Amino acid sequence: MAPLLGRKPFPLVKPLPGEEPLFTIPHTQEAFRTREEYEARLERYSERIWTCKSTGSSQLTHKEAWEEEQEVAELLKEEFPNWYEKLVLEMVHHNTASLEKLVDSAWLEIMTKYAVGEECDFEVGKEKMLKVKIVKIHPLEKVDEEAVEKKSDGACDSPSSDKENSSQMAQDLQKKETVVKEDEGRRESINDRARRSPRKLPTSLKKGERKWAPPKFLPHKYDVKLQNEDKIISNVPADSLIRTERPPNKEILRYFIRHNALRAGTGENAPWVVEDELVKKYSLPSKFSDFLLDPYKYMTLNPSTKRRNTGSPDRKPSKKPKRDSSSLSSPLNPKLWCHVHLEKSLNGPPLKVKNSKNSKSPEEHLEGVMKIMSPNNNKLHSFHIPKKGPAAKKPGKHSDKPLKAKGRGKGILNGQKSTGNSKSPSKCVKTPKTKMKQMTLLDMAKGTQKMTRTPRSSGGVPRSSGKPHKHLPPAALHLIAYYKENKDKEDKKSALSCVISKTARLLSNEDRARLPEELRALVQKRYELLEHKKRWASMSEEQRKEYLKKKRQELKERLREKAKERREREMLERLEKQKRFEDQELGGRNLPAFRLVDTPEGLPNTLFGDVALVVEFLSCYSGLLLPDAQYPITAVSLMEALSADKGGFLYLNRVLVILLQTLLQDEIAEDYGELGMKLSEIPLTLHSVSELVRLCLRRCDVQEDSEGSETDDNKDSTPFEDNEVQDEFLEKLETSEFFELTSEEKLRILTALCHRILMTYSVQDHMETRQQVSAELWKERLAVLKEENDKKRAEKQKRKEMEARNKENGKEENVLGKVDRKKEIVKIEQQVEVEADDMISAVKSRRLLSMQAKRKREIQERETKVRLEREAEEERMRKHKAAAEKAFQEGIAKAKLVLRRTPIGTDRNHNRYWLFSNEVPGLFIEKGWVHNSIDYRFKHHRKDHSNLPDDDYCPRSKKANLGKNASVNAHHGPALEAVETTVPKQGQNLWFLCDSQKELDELLSCLHPQGIRESQLKERLEKRYQEITHSIYLARKPNLGLKSCDGNQELLNFLRSDLIEVATRLQKGGLGYMEGTSEFEARVISLEKLKDFGECVIALQASVIKKFLQGFMAPKQKKRKLQSEDSTKSEEVDEEKKMVEEAKVASALEKWKTAIREAQTFSRMHVLLGMLDACIKWDMSAENARCKVCRKKGEDDKLILCDECNKAFHLFCLRPALYEVPDGEWQCPACQPPTARRNSRGRNYTEESTSEGSEGDESGEEEEEEEEEEEEEEDYEVAGLRLRPRKTIRGKQSVIPAARPGRPPGKKSHPARRSRPKDDPEVDDLVLQTKRISRRQSLELQKCEDILHKLVKYRFSWPFREPVTRDEAEDYYDVIEHPMDFQTIQNKCSCGNYRSVQEFLTDMKQVFANAELYNCRGSHVLSCMEKTEQCLLALLQKHLPGHPYVRRKRRKFPDRLADDEGDSDSESVGQSRGRRQKK
């Protein structure tokens, strides 16, 4: 569809094949290669010479006409129902009437008839309507036609009088009025239901001056089909049908005709021609030949050829050259030759045809007659047998056929040249005229038997002895020309096939042999097929069976041979493709040149590999390093931070914090320390991380002076590894911050940290967990697949059984069912006949129908409910499967992430290709990756050759992996002997980037498919094509940039704020005495130099109260013990130990102070301040304490904390109340011994404390117990837990009574060896004290029993509820020395074996320690143990908050015990893993 140029169609430019158009016209999308053509076409389109085909509007531009046609097309889609299209197009096609007449006749046809396919309503009753569709229209009967004619005449044929006529007229008028009212009501309902046009109606319809009545429907009868059911109702009268869709008006019809048809000519009688697509779609009958009807269309598609001279010299020129030219210059068409369909009616009466003995077809008869009629045999080939159209089949038109045949044959005879050498040209022209005028087809059919044989026999002699230059028959020439024109056209395939069949029938063997090669095979094949059909028709049934059997065997043999040849050919091709050669020896296209990776100024391209290492490590292990899903570290940002002078402080230190958080919490870093304190206990912040990195990466810790020289001697002899850094880098870190180093030094430190973390147990556990999760996911997947297969197998088996059962019972059920159905039908018919008589039966039937409807509705509701439930279940299963599939894919991807990253492959030049994660987007090419530490070689084998890296190869980084060369073609067998003959050359390590999909496609096209390296690279690149293109797309996203920050100023500000914060907390918590806090803050804010800050830190440490210090800053304070008179020697030893410990503490403190004074960096000062922070007992602070009596905060100056239980009391809340804070240690009333409480009323606390310190002595047994307590405290400190087991100490101290002055105290000893007391009052005191303690302990033990009862009910505690038997684990008692379980603990609780909460907790720890010792890592018992222990901790915190639960976990030693029982040497642990203490 396109606008007309004037009144002629103007074809659009065809699209360019396979090339991108350079110049395109917007509204038609026509493409041009050159600007000249494009501008010329635009200039022509802008002229006002175009006509809209649909509306007829002229003097428009091409775009205006185009848009008007589009608008008309949209209007027709809305306003013209599709069931009228065929009806109107059949009337229009090849019609010579004017447009207005066509519109009127089409409108009248639509208004008086329903169209086939039209959807309307079928009126069954007064209120019931059924949706139906017209299937068939019955023609009008004769009676109806006469009635219609009579109504149209309007005359009265009745012979009655005027009076009768007037009465009859009155009746007729009344009937007409009622009919008109019904029609109006029906029209109104139709108009209500009909679609309203969005366009404006014509003005004629808007005028309300005169009521217009539409024409009535003709009394046709229709077959209709119900839309809801597959039923057809026949012979429905037109009155029972109601049209629901409004028919189109005349304006819409006019648009439709113009839009889809074009008038072929400018005359009044020029026929209308419908578009070819619609003709094919609706199979519209053609009334004329195509080339006569569509000259414009023909001239646009076929350029005009040179016109032949059609007349003889004697004839006059034609008066109508246009028509002659159009008829003579017709295209090659199957209608011209051999594509003839003659009817038997042409050859005369059917009896004569049947009686003729010749069995030849009518076409052959006619050709034989024409041979006789033509004076020269060569004239036969110019005879044309026309194809009769559909109009020829109509009755009453047989008289025109001979004339048409003669006329067409005559025109074609005149239009063709003679192919033979005629001796008299005058005869050639005159004889066909006279004979064609005298003969008729009837005469030709009568004389075919006598006349057809002579020319063939006579014509055969000159054919065999003809001249060497023999011409092909016209049928062959026509086939050649028709094949050349239409061989590639899809719509001409059937016509071309018919032409080939007819030519194969007519041509002889010699003529077929003289055809061109391409056509010769087609015609010969068609000839053999036709011959085969003839032979098949003449065969008997047995011969056919035998022939088919033989054919099948031959076909099988042929297919078998072809399949064998194809397999051999494919195998040879596969083997040829599988051969591999050295890439550099093969020819081919050069690889594309990629650009270098963009790096910031100051960061060389050679360091990009290390940047990718760090970022890829952080990305792959993000589940371990970044569990809180922080924003990721990207390569672009990291490079900017490395190259920035001051702006990279925050970004780089964040990376260091992420790495050190994992390293310092691992067992490998247990022995990392500084000044006697573990690095894991020092606060890790952005400001201390630089110094902590230096301390972690030292090759050895600072030892004592005696060990220092030995360490220095061994330092140089040890080999340098990837997880270590050169000493000169670390020495720079002593005097400068991390962000102040060069880019290369920063990267070396980051890579060393990554390698160090790869050696930790945390990484190993993370990898094992990921692999275990992946294995479990695979198990679940296989189990699900197995279950589905079992279900399918069971369903299939069940279906087979049901089918077998149905086959057995099917026949009997069918017979019984038919009989029952017949009986039911008979009964129903009888019931209907009987019950239709009276009113009662009508009521019954109505009730029965309502019951049936109700039952049917219930059944439908039940089915709907079942269907909805089934759909909901299917949706739930679908979501579950989708979630399981997502979890499976994520688990597999995470398991792959933690494995070693290898390159995709290498190219001919040994360059490696890398694809990293989304944080390092793009496809990277690494050149010059080989260095001196790589021994690149491969081994020769007898069967196959594989290149293996050296076993001693130690990777420089994650880049150095030679997996691409290992056993490249081992699976291809011994036939493929490919050996690499080149090795990668050493050179500068450079990184290139493929950053566009075009470059990737070019790379894939340049890689050789048979190169030993490039074939594998190409295969992997194609496999991961989508992933690579996504990564390339991510590489184009812009970087957000870094937050600018001055690192030195940041460190200075935070050091000031940290100092002020520690001082404030000390004062508020009552942990230190600092005079002039405001002055101290002002002084700190004004400081700039490190030395001044150091003095402030030392002053801060001095202000802390000694008893609130711990770690290396607090002396080992032994409580003064009651001794007997004969224990002076042990007291001297004790004093010596105390002096040694105090000396050690003093020396450690002095070292710390010296380190502060010598600190050269702010991060070092932050670390030393963090040590002070870690040595302060912040849990003893009164800042957040509440009074135990009134539960209120505030009034810190009147709040006192118990040194035993650490609970707070207001001075005035105590009874008796205190009026000032006592000096020294103070115990609350609950922690004081009862005798001391009773005897201390009215006594000063200071005197009592001094008297307690000066009186009494203690036996050696008590001293051993105290030493055990101290060792236990040391164990807590070694484990890095700054908690005191104060409940245990309190329980043991509270047994010791505070004796009165001048009286020897009682001795605390083992219960079995307890000596009898001397004085009765003392015995009474002890009894009272014991009762008091026993009541409190019994309450606590009752709570312990309740906790145990809840633990037994906990669902994850099932492995620990009962003792382990030897049936469950044979070697359990060989590994576990002290078995323990919840049942045993429960029995001990019921028997009263526990004397304190600590004994109960000791057994609980033993249960968990045994589980941890016996079970392997990753087992379900260990996971249950962790959850049960967490539950125990929560219960203890809720019910027994004063009893801390701490269990030390040691993974390496199988013979470990609980923390409070065994004394393990932490130094041996430190020497067995991680850094070497001594080299």
Swiss-Prot record:
Class of the enzyme per the UniProt entry, highest EC level: transferase
Coiled coil, from the record: 537-587, 774-809, 854-890, 1257-1284
Enzyme Commission number: 2.7.10.2
Modified residues (Phosphoserine): 152, 158, 161, 325, 330, 345, 361, 374, 706, 709, 717, 1315, 1338, 1464, 1466, 1468
InterPro entries linked: BAZ1B (IPR047174), BAZ1B_Bromo (IPR037375), BAZ1B_PHD (IPR047256), Bromodomain (IPR001487), Bromodomain-like_sf (IPR036427), Bromodomain_CS (IPR018359), DDT_dom (IPR018501), WHIM1_dom (IPR028942)
Gene3D superfamilies membership: Bromodomain-like, Zinc/RING finger domain, C3HC4 (zinc finger)
Keyword Cell membrane (UniProt): no
Catalytic activity: L-tyrosyl-[protein] + ATP = O-phospho-L-tyrosyl-[protein] + ADP + H(+)
Comp. bias (Basic residues): 381-396, 1305-1316
Domain Bromo: 1335-1439
One GO molecular-function entry: non-membrane spanning protein tyrosine kinase activity
UniProt feature, compositional bias: Low complexity: 454-465
Protein name per Swiss-Prot or TrEMBL: Tyrosine-protein kinase BAZ1B
